């Protein structure tokens, strides 16, 4: 019997579904908070500029926390960290529902970001225990649908609840949801004995190249989330959020295509092509004429390439990193991503404010192009 005729290992297990659900709900909850917390802060007296402080503090907490929560998961166990962070997440959400002062939001944002990073790194590391080795790329591609799914649905529901019932119901029902997820997290597979690090360990050199690629990509991505809708409003587009919506569509379509086609024996070989696709999408956003059609076309191309970058880099880490250091490796990757988002949103935002949107999009594309030599080297390793 040839290898082609051998049955494929089962991918859709209960444990995989639980890890998928944890990630979906994490992004589903976050992207209900991100658009509604600023609105709540405005109700409490914050100015338009001040209302952005929550996101800045949250991202800072996530970036810094990722460096420590990753190694912590290696030491205490990823399942234990998933459960702990889910329960803490519920406490933060319930706390937001009770707050009547905007300063309370600012005080909670930074530690909440740390818990967010712990939940993401521990969930990603737990995924290694539920994916069969011969189907890791397929599993990561399917798993990658969780975050864009949450991003698509979360803002729509969050804004609807806020408009009809205020902010408190969002905090309360999401807190209850995370309490349930924390309890379900106790049923995740136990960490393997060899997966417990003897002490805190920083990621090795194998993580540096993936971090550099993701950092360069995040520089442009950080500006997209903050400013594409504002450009849409300035241009009078009928759907100002067209770029973000069609980016998510591109992400989902590419993942469906790759699930059908497969990744081959060495998925990382596809990294340079996906990076070029994302670069082309952002370049089109900077160069094409018009408004709505430009946003839609560039977003589809950008989303298709961008979505697979995370999958391919995560698969590379699972393949090359010592199991005892997986948590710290994913933490370093999350740190690089969040740091890039923060720096890109700040620096490209300044460029956009002083020189226009198109120059900002162009510089974001150049930042991605700078990662191409590293991506080519990773594809050959």
For the regions a language model picked out, list residue spans one by one.
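Helix-loop boundary and gating motifs at the non-cytosolic
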Residues: 14-44, 48-52, 221-231
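Residue-level signature of mid-helix packing/kink "hotspots" within the transmembrane helices
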Residues: 59-67, 151-152, 251-256, 342
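Conserved MFS/SLC helix-loop-helix module at the cytosolic interface between two early adjacent transmembrane helices
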Residues: 64-96
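Helix-to-loop junctions at the C-terminal end of transmembrane segments
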Residues: 66-77, 254-267
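Structural signature of the two symmetry-related core transmembrane helices
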Residues: 81-94, 269-283
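Paired small-residue
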Residues: 103-111, 293-301
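Cytoplasmic helix-loop-helix junction between adjacent transmembrane helices
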Residues: 110-146
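C-terminal membrane-cytosol helix-exit motif in multi-pass small-molecule transporters
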Residues: 175-193, 374-378
């Amino acid at each position: 019997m040839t290898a082609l005729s051998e049955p494929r290992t089962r991918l859709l297990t209960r444990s995989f579904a639980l890890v998928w659900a944890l990630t979906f709900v994490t992004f589903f909850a976050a992207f209900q908070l991100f658009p509604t917390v600023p609105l709540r802060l405005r109700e409490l007296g914050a100015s338009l500029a001040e209302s952005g402080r929550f996101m800045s503090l949250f991202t800072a907490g996530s970036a810094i926390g990722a460096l420590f929560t990753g190694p912590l998961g290696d030491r205490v166990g990823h399942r234990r960290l998933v459960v702990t962070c889910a329960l803490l997440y519920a406490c933060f959400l319930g706390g937001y529902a009770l707050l009547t002062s905007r300063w309370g939001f600012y005080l909670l944002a930074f530690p909440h970001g740390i818990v967010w990073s712990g939940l993401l790194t521990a969930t990603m590391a737990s995924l290694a225990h539920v994916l069969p080795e011969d189907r890791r790329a397929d599993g990561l591609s399917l798993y990658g649908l969780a975050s864009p799914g949450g991003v698509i649905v979360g803002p729509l529901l969050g804004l609807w609840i806020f408009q009809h019932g205020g902010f408190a119901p969002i905090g309360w029902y999401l807190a209850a949801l995370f309490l349930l997820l924390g309890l379900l997290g106790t049923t995740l597979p136990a960490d393997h004995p060899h997966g417990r690090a003897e002490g805190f360990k920083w990621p090795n050199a194998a993580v540096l190249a993936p971090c550099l690629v993701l950092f360069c990509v995040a520089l442009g991505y950080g500006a997209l989330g903050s400013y594409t809708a504002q450009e849409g409003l300035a241009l009078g587009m009928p759907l100002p959020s067209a770029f973000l919506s069609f980016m998510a569509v591109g992400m989902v379509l590419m993942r469906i295509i790759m699930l059908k086609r497969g990744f081959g024996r060495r998925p990382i070989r596809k990294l340079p092509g996906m990076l070029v696709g994302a670069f082309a999408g952002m370049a089109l956003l900077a160069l094409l004429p018009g408004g709505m059609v430009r946003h839609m076309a560039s977003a589809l191309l950008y989303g298709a390439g961008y979505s697979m970058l995370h999958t391919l880099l995560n698969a590379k880490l699972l393949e090359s990193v010592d199991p005892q250091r997986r948590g710290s490796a994913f933490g370093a990757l999350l740190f690089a991503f969040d740091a890039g988002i923060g720096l890109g949103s700040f620096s490209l935002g300044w460029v956009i404010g002083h020189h226009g949107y198109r120059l900002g999009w162009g510089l974001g594309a150049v930042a991605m192009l700078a990662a191409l030599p590293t991506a080519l080297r990773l594809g050959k390793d």
